[in-house]
Amino acid sequence: MLELITDFSKKSFKNYSMKEELKFNAINIIYGVNGRGKTSLARGIKEIIEENNPDSLRYFYTDYIHELLLLEDSNKFKGVKATFGTKNVEIENKIIKLKNEVVDMTDTKKLLVEKRRKLRELINEIHKSRKGNLKIPLKSSNKSIEEVIAIYEKNLKDAKKIEHNIESIRNFVANDETLYNKYNSIYEVMIPSLKIETYDVDRLTKILQNNYTDIKIPSFEVIDWLRNGLELHNVEESICKFCGNNLNYNLIKEKIEIYLLNEKKKDFDYLKDVEKSIEQLSDNYEQYLSNIDIFVNELGVQKSVEESLGDSIDEIKRILKQKLGNMENDNLKFPSDDYITLISRLSEIEEECKEKKKIKLKELNKKTENINVIVTGSISLEILENQSIREELSSIQYEENECKKQEQLNEEINAKISKLHENQSDYNDFKIYLNGVFESINLHIRLKSDETTQNYYLYHDLENISLNIKDISEGEKNLIAFLFFYFELFEDEKQETIKSNIKTLIIDDPINSFDEANRFYVLELIKKVLKSKFNQIFIFTHSWNDFCDITYRLKGEDHNFYEVYKDHQGTSFLEKFKKVKTPYKKLFQEIYELSRKSQKDIVEEDCYYYHSINSIRRVFEEFLSFKLKNSDLAQKSNQPEIEEVYRKMTGNEMSNNKKIKLGSFLTIINVLSHKPYRAIDVIGSAKFLMRYIEDVDKAHYDAMKD
């Protein structure tokens, strides 16, 4: 049994040696606020014990589930050996008997696959031999024979709609590629786009005849904005309604008129767009002319004087190019009538080509479809009337049905074998027992054995789905981890017999992120641990409530209670409790001691201050509960009620300076409880709280601090 630690150094413990009067007992309950070195002490004790007999120690800590339970790169848990019942040799005999009942269907399935392949080949050969030179594709290879037969039955029905004589369908011979070649050649004819945007002829005429002068002007959007804004004013007004500055109505009006008169840039861009469209139209028209014989001879497009349209296009291109080259040239005339006629006629040509192509394809398609349908019907008839195909398919279907029945039976037998293997496994009893515990505490998580029967994975018993460790809450993770830790300690399901090799327990923060029901459940397990016959137990906790619950009614001379402290230099040490205080008084005295500190007492690496803000808020809430029915008033939004408590208890109004400090205090204890902050602000909050309580209730203050 470990009694004293000497020359111990780990993090905030600096060459620490315990005094003789502090030496450890059989049961040791150690309290420490987060940041004081509690976990460092737990790990240090673990390392000391492991030096002599590592197998005798069980150590529970924050990362127990990740470091000791989870398998690497997996969401599986390591199995726990436990034999809570006798293993019957009859299980093995049952397994052997069941294995003999399993029929291997591998060869049968391969044979059936081969039979289907050969039958499909026969169907395809009939199809190929009857289709002649027509492009009638084979049925999709990914369809079953049954699906293919159904398609052929439909094909025959379609053929009968065209050719009612069944003998004509049976004797129909396919031998015509001409229709297909014709269809493909027409289908591949590309009709160029001869439609363009119809531009404003009047504007084009105006631009071509306009003589522009070069004046720097704002953007047309700005000009438009100025013009609209000016309409909201009148000539007598001298102040702008928008900005409030001086307004010269006539000067602004004159400038707008100048800007509006010069639209050279805008018109230039417009002409460029027109030129680009005409260029594209010219290219497309040339493409049309190069294929004119196809359009006329193959599609039946009427040929008239369309070739002369190219001259009109070239003339428009020439005029646009001249104007764009010299915007001051006002001697150009836009051929409006020719342009309108050109655009209209080209659009008609494109529509005529499209319509003629559509009609031609429809005509050819109808002819080819009739041939295809009848030929396909002829193919279908031969396949459907083939006696060998019908008999072979019927035989295959019967054998497959028998094979499926045997496979289902094999699955049932293998499920029974797996269940027997689980029952035979040394890891199964622990799983069954722990699942019973999960059910008893209304936790809808269960363990299932993996294929090795030596590991477990999680699943949800209601939704019946597998769970990853990330799918469950922190509280559930911690609960599962502690249950694994606890039940692994015992040989029997009643937790009466400890495994013989286990002598020492170290449990660091066993209660973390639990709801109240699970917290009390784990507390009861800890109390059972304390009553069990271990050589030595160390339990560490950062929660004073948990410390009080664990130590409650713990009697006898075999236990000690400790607290981890830090001195002003940030060095950790142990003190023994003489008397356990109530949780509120303990927190009060911690905050009281904190309020007596100053800037010089702060050690930079000491995170104790950052954890203390929660304790400050809890003490304040508890104190307010003595004064008000609503104990949730420790919020910035409830500052008036807190000020009223001060007024009623002291008989004085709170000064403005104190009100400001109260507001700052309420903000800090609510905001900083969720994130770290400066230690000096935490100390300042502790000082404010103690002053407030002392002012409001001096008797309470004196009773709690001593």
Swiss-Prot record:
Source taxon at top rank: Bacteria
Keyword Coiled coil applies: yes
InterPro entries membership: CR006_AAA, P-loop_NTPase
Keywords: Coiled coil
Residue stretches in coiled coil: 86-162, 269-299, 337-427
Protein name: Uncharacterized chromosomal cassette SCCmec type IVc protein CR006
